[in-house]
């Protein structure tokens, strides 16, 4: 456990370290910048899913709005899943 994890008094507090990433989604109407926030939980509700990534914008807004996200046991898994989700649908904002 990382040192900061000892600040959590109870698992229900869901203490997490936040990592920020940026990516450019390239599409016909121009490039769109997405910020991805990855939370690294001390004690996740699901033991194999320590990392949760979520984009700052929705995609597919005109049909069925979707906020790209991804879970994983590593930061790479969660971040990669979120990037794939961003690229799955067009940004229509």
Task: Locate each region found by the language model.
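A short, exposed loop/beta-hairpin motif centered on an aromatic-Gly-Thr core
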Residues: 59-77
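Stable alpha-helical structural segments in soluble proteins, enriched in small hydrophobic residues
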Residues: 74, 78-86
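Local alpha-helix boundary/kink/capping signal
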Residues: 17, 59-61, 84
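Short intrinsically disordered terminal tails
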Residues: 1-2, 87-93
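Short stretches within intrinsically disordered, low-complexity N-terminal or propeptide regions
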Residues: 9, 18, 55-57, 80
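Acidic, low-complexity, intrinsically disordered interaction modules
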Residues: 28-32, 42-65
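A structural detector for beta-sheet-dominated domains
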Residues: 21, 37-41
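Negatively charged, low-complexity tracts enriched in Asp/Glu with abundant Ser/Thr
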Residues: 1-33
